Swiss-Prot record:
Self-association state and partner proteins as the record states: Homodimer.
Segments crossing the lipid bilayer: none
Protein name: Uroporphyrinogen decarboxylase
Keywords per UniProt: Cytoplasm, Decarboxylase, Lyase, Porphyrin biosynthesis
Described purpose of this protein according to its UniProt entry: Catalyzes the decarboxylation of four acetate groups of uroporphyrinogen-III to yield coproporphyrinogen-III.
Gene: hemE
Pfam families (alphabetical): URO-D
Amino acid sequence: MGENLPLLLSAALGKKVNRPPVWMMRQAGRYMKIYRDLRERYPSFRERSENPELSYEISMQPFLAFKPDGVILFSDILTPLPGMGINFEIIESKGPIIEDPIRNIRQVEKLKELIPNESLSFVGEVLSSLKKDVKNEATVLGFVGAPWTLAAYVVEGKSSKNYSLIKSMAFKEPDLLHKLLDHFAKSIGEYLKYQIKSGAQVVQIFDSWAGQLSPQDYDIFAGPYQKKVVDIVKEEFPDTPIILYISGSAGVLERMAKTGVDIISLDWTVDIEEACKRIPTGIGIQGNVDPGILFGNKDSIKERIDNTFNKVKERKYILNLGHGILPGTPEENAKTFFEHGKKLTY
């Protein structure tokens, strides 16, 4: 690997760095005018995320504008589904719609094995272009959705407020759900390895909806499958740092730490000082800043960044938001977040 590593990768590996790296979840997207202009020309989300030229261009937009320390692939957690035989569409302002929601064993048994270099070659293309072009100026990030969250989408058929369909399956037909989760874990593990081979230097697992589970159900339906994904990746790439993000994770932080990930990405509903006490010291911490602060003034943004960093500076830390940046966020304020983040020092 050599010692001349980009900052975010160095920090994620636990090496000594002069400042915490900074990037943002959803840093490429709707808050940027350049993205909205491109979206008018290419209204289909799937085209924007599956056409390698467009995905590359969008991934680079925030890098060219703000020079964050991480450049994350522009894609979606549902992108691998068609390669398993599950079709979906993303409708602007409505979110994802699964064409044929999975509700029975026949459908699970019909799922195809994911072969990423066949069904997701466009992702490999984008990651290798990013790696080539950002050089050591930033770290290239890949990402996937975790098995529970993918299952929540494909069983519900769309975003849900109370997850009654997948919870019904969990408590009435747990064997069926475990088969589906197991299929996803193997596929997602392979997909992450493909991303790493293609150029991703750090990867993040999003289990966006695992915060909807009680801790005891997390131990049955989410944690073991997160761990399975991590184990598959670490077997071949033991040195690639893995970040785990769950929205609403305050009740399961200790459990997240047992999955084998290197870094836990916090939402903003947990005090970061308390999180530091609950997460073992060998595990890094990312995020925790409320994305809503970016609707405030510049001073409040700087103050919140300083306040968060001062509580966590004894730890391996990556500055980020506690959720994706929100549509409508002023671009000037995103710029302040990055600029001020780069002024922090250990």
